[in-house]
Amino acid sequence: MSQTDLSRELYQSLWNAADILRGQMEANEYKSYLLGLIFYKYLSDNILQAVCDNLDETFESFQQAQLLYEENFADTDVREDLIEVLNDELGYVIEPSLTFTKLVQSIHEGTFQLESLAQSFRDIEQANEKFENLFEDIDLYAKKLGNTPQKQNKTISEVMKQLNDLNVSGHAGDILGDAYEYLIGQFASDSGKKAGEFYTPQAVSHLMTQIVFAGREHQKGMSVYDPTMGSGSLLLNAKRYSKEASTISYYGQELITSTFNLARMNMMLHGVAIENYHLSNHDTLDEDWPTTEPTDFDGVLMNPPYSLKWSADSGFLQDPRFSSYGVLAPKSKADFAFLLHGFYHLKHNGVMAIVLPHGVLFRGAAEQKIRQHLLEEGAIDTVIGLPANIFYNTSIPTTIIILKKNRTNKDVFFIDASKEFEKGKNQNNMTEDHIAKILETYQKRENIEKFAHLASFEEIVENDYNLNIPRYVDTFEEEPVVPLTDLADQLAEIDKEIGEVEARLAHMRSQLVGTTPEAQAELTAYLEKLKEI
């Protein structure tokens, strides 16, 4: 089976498991259950694979590996060494009685208890600080799973049985990670506006990541940072565009705990080593992070919540992230606060890509002062206008702003990619061809009529530091000149058609007859009234 067929089969199987929960709760709610159980199976299957490897036994099936694990765990001479090896290798241990395979076996035997699954979750969370509170969003006793303990048990049992046939550990790395991303994308589509908190469409992620990684594909030890990471999809795209993916260090921050947990699972399912990712569950603007080395990064990738309210407390004027600008982003729109936070954590030779609404390009007052400061120091390298309606949480057009610290000039390159899309059922989509066109234009940095323009700093000053894309890229299409004689002919033809329609309508009205004297009188009065109009 080809990798494409394998991925397609895996995607479909995972989505079928979601059908069991779909009728009982919103996608935004059931994603935690399904993704959490997939992750638990992944950890559990890895244990059984590792048991076979460390006991020099060929892995044949999870049932065979389960029996091997039970036998050796029961042997007191082997147990402690086996636990130590598993902890060293995987960073956690799941006892034989609590593996996914064992619990599914108990489901078929009619002895399964939700408490066994809850205990397994607790054991995993306590095994390693990176697993702490990982499953806290999964309430196994929630009423939405069923009104009685028996119904709750049955719902979870059905999902586990559906997932049981999947060899998720066999798909570890990008195949399983991509399947997980597929599910997250499907949840985002189902969730609508609620999805914006955790997902950036893949096309946008690919475009931003390729820009940040341009010329760095072979760099070892690359560090990437996303202070509003959501599910981590934007960060994880770094793996696709690096020839040294195993050496990348990932840093991310997320305020919403359920989304933070999603990102942690996503990292592991993509095969990222525990020591290579560093994630924080805090408020990015209120609590600067990281504050200990390393604090700056080769690449910064961001898709923050748009025009979010924040405190804008005057104390932030002393915060090193914002102090050199003399003003703060307005309380009603934190867009520039997020941008300055990311820029502060960018290395001198790094590249930053951030998605924001178009308002940041032209709004006045404090935002204009911040924008002017950034332009005067040459920080804004490129502005890319994206198509409208490509995000799940908003239909407004957005822009990617590329920032750098080591530029020797202050010009700004503008790309109007607002028409680079194909229409989808609910959203517009950017294809690989659209992305390739934008990337090629970005790299060449040359003027293209109605698509791209390299604006000098003097030109920007003349525009009062307003970066609104239409000021620099003229996409106006003139209407073709139509001779007046042609217009007269068209009007005459239209008048003729109107006359024909009115004649047909008058004929149809003349055929109307009332079924009673009263109805006939009313109809006659109606027709007389029409003649007066």
Regions from the language model: what does each represent?
Residues M1-V212, H278-T284, G385-A388, K410-S418, ...:
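Non-catalytic, mostly N-terminal accessory regions of nucleic-acid modification and defense proteins
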Residues Q3-D5, E287, T292-I533:
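A conserved structural/catalytic subdomain of Rossmann-like adenosyl-cofactor enzymes
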Residues K41-V51, F187, R216, S242, ...:
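A generic secondary-structure signal for well-formed alpha-helical elements
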Residues V168, E217-H218, H345:
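Surface-exposed acidic, glycine-flexible loop patches that form ligand/cofactor-binding
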Residues K194-M302, S307-F316, R321-Y325, F336-A337, ...:
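Conserved S-adenosyl-L-methionine
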